[in-house]
Amino acid sequence: MCGIVGAVAERNVTAILIEGLKRLEYRGYDSAGLAVIDNASIVRERRSGKVKELEAAVEQAQVNGHIGIAHTRWATHGAPTQDNAHPHISGDVAVVHNGIIENYEELRTELRAQGYVFVSQTDTEVVAHLVHRELEKTQELLAAVKEAIKHLDGAYALGIIHASEPERLIAVRQGSPLVVGLGIGENFIGSDQLALLPVTNRFIYLEDGDVIELRRESITIYDRYDSVVQRDATELDAQLHHSDKAGYRHYMLKEIYEQPQAIQRTLEGRIQESGLINEQAFGGNAAEIFAKVKHIQIIACGTSYHAGYVARYWFEGIAGVSCNVEVASEYRYRTSILPADTLFVTISQSGETADTLAALREAKKQGILASLCICNVPTST
């Protein structure tokens, strides 16, 4: 899963961007990059490999800027190379992107016919060229972004800057997570709040279709109908959110050794000593709903998928309920038949895995009995 960080501030934002990327490393990635505006020019550094390699390059080049965007990439379109790393640039426009542009091949063909040259294999470069094309028509960045996204099919989150606008960052959320962090005289965007906790604990959780205009002293949110809207800010306890490795060599080792405590914390407050569930933890009528379950469908990706297979043994061996486990990326694209008495269980560390969310949306269309989502981020989608 990729990660986005963006900042508009009076101070140099490069350290904020790098620290944000480090705090998103738990998502996994194969390359990283950032871009800032300095003296009306875009300064970009990208590296395949670890964020620390990008950090060294940024320090050596003495990159400095009061506005910038950064990204960790997990390759989907194109190999994990420096040329494919974000941000991508078209003219004076720089873009970072999470998600998948499903019609990128058609857009690439169209843009090539209009004279645009592609230097990467990514779907993201299409977005940069689209914004540049629309900017040539409108001469206004916000209007250009709004027009460009009308051509995009898929799920995406975007962060966009323009060299001539050192005080404004444009962001978009459509089917891929993005939050706004609120500071004092500075504002931020991130794929999740973990990336921004060193600089703020006040967040606005965006909705699909939102286009956001960030300045140092203000933010403006336009909804899917292009109306200006106000969204409530949430204040988080930073102590409750940890992304460090706690002395372990890597996150996998940390998570392996944390399993006993994680299981205990998960059960506490949800299962009573009598063995009955605490309905308040699962929502109203939970016991009645669970009693009606005759089949369980588990959907997940990666190691969450492996955890789902462990759960299958428990559901069938202990509860005596039939259970099926499937990879979300396979499930969402096939025609599936679910019994009406199915409990649809999704597992996602971040609560934002795109394929898992898409699978859940498809299942809800079928009229399942209920859904149960297991994740580490209560404020996620």
Cite the ranges covered by each PLM segment.
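Conserved short alpha-helical segments that host acidic/polar catalytic motifs at enzyme active sites
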Residues: 1-245, 249-250, 258-294
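Generic, well-ordered alpha-helical scaffold segments in large soluble proteins
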Residues: 110, 114, 130, 134, ...
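Internal active-site segments that recognize and position negatively charged phosphoryl groups
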Residues: 250, 254, 304
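Glycine-rich phosphate-binding loops that contact phosphosugars or nucleotide phosphates
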Residues: 291-381
